[in-house]
Regions:
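Short, electropositive alpha-helical surface patch
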Residues: 84-101
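Small-molecule kinase domains that catalyze NTP-dependent phosphoryl transfer to phosphate-bearing small molecules
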Residues: 101-128
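Walker A (P-loop) ATP-phosphate-binding motif of ABC ATPase nucleotide-binding domains
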Residues: 2
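Conserved lysine of the Walker
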Residues: 13
Length: 128
């Protein structure tokens, strides 16, 4: 299972990802995490154009697929502002759940397409 946590910068994606990882580990699951900021640093991808973002998300999705095949629960936390990019990522995985975190901020000249059919929409009223 791959959990894709999405939302604007500063919305709390990493916080929720870490809390979810802790809960899953306490239930006995082996968990792997991919965080957008950490992944970008690791891959040294400084290209924030659409092409660069797609390449980064594609690499992350492929890494998550390998871990999913190995039996891990995967938690990915990425801004992924375009619906088609999120769908591209999810197409790599056997089973996934989209988690949208509202709030946060966005870079100038960047539009965030909110999930229209999100499977789980977390709000400030949920305590993890």
């Amino acid at each position: 299972m791959v959990y894709l946590i999405t939302g604007k910068a500063g919305a709390g994606k990493t916080h929720y990802a870490e809390a979810l990882a802790k809960e899953l580990q306490e239930e006995g699951y082996q968990v792997r995490m991919l965080d957008g900021d950490t992944f970008r640093k690791k891959t040294k991808n400084k290209d924030y154009t659409d092409k660069g973002r797609i390449a980064n998300l594609n690499k992350a999705a492929r890494q998550a697929r390998e871990w999913e095949r190995a039996g891990y629960m995967i938690i990915c936390s990425f801004v992924s502002p375009r619906k088609k990019w999120r769908n591209m990522m999810r197409s790599f995985w056997k089973e996934s759940l989209l988690i949208y975190i509202p709030g946060g901020t966005l870079w100038k000249d960047t539009t965030y397409e909110k999930p229209t059919e999100d499977e789980l929409n977390l709000t400030h009223k949920i305590n993890i």
